Amino acid sequence: MITYTRTANAGGILEMDGVRILLDGVSQAVNDYLATPPDLLNTLYDTHLDMIAFTHNHSDHFQPEFVRSYVKHHPLPKLIGPKDVAADLSDYAVITASSSVGAVQLIAVPSRHMGAEYTDTPHYSFLIRGSSLDWFMGDASPPQWKGQDHFPHPDVLIAPYAYASTEAAWEITEQITQGKILLTHLPDKERDSAQLWPAVEKVLDQHDRFRVRIPRMGDVCEVY
């Protein structure tokens, strides 16, 4: 069984083949986007992690203070992220490329961040290959994958709301995978000033919603 537990705005713990990977798993509140709640943060401090991976250096995805506190009480996990993540964790050996633990391989895919203002932001998405193939997008922009047939089609796609907020984006999402989809990076419905929830629900109502899940904070999803 492979599980994903949401612990942050756009990330969480992926547990596959006995390996635990924290993916963008601790966040600070930014605008309507959610911070990691204190109870989940305490749980993370008590959890053995084999890898900690960050897609990019934005505070709703990356909290270097968590790493510094975590390693005071645990052996140093493998740390993976782009160059500006490595710069903010310069006391540790951050891997700025692909890596593996046991039978699980994490493949760093250079990706373009959503939004024209973030064109120069170093950003990875992560392919996680073990007994299933999962793709964790972080904040990777959907249009960059259009027509990119050389990428494998994952069994599970973990992606931000933008992959289902318009019909054009959903068409790309369906080209990426016919497997399960976990949508992240959505605020609480009660604090959704950008009206992201209505946009996503409008698209999903027109398509095969049964394979899409939008986990709440702390939800454990059996993904494979």
Named regions from a protein language model:
Residues 19-30, 94-99, 103-114, 139-142, ...:
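Conserved catalytic scaffold of divalent metal-dependent phosphoesterases
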Residues 7-10, 29-30, 58-64, 86-89, ...:
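Active-site environment of divalent metal-dependent phosphoester hydrolases
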Residues 40-99:
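Active-site HxH/HxHxD metal-binding segment of metal-dependent hydrolases
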Residues 23-26, 48-60, 79-83, 135-140, ...:
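Active-site neighborhood of phospho(di)ester-bond hydrolases with catalytic His/Asp-centered motifs
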Residues 113-175:
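Active-site-proximal loop/helix segments of hydrolase catalytic cores
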Residues 1-41, 119-139:
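Conserved beta-strand hairpin/beta-sheet module of binuclear metal-dependent hydrolase folds
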Residues 17-53, 64-69, 116, 141-152:
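Pre-active-site segment of Zn-dependent metallo-hydrolases
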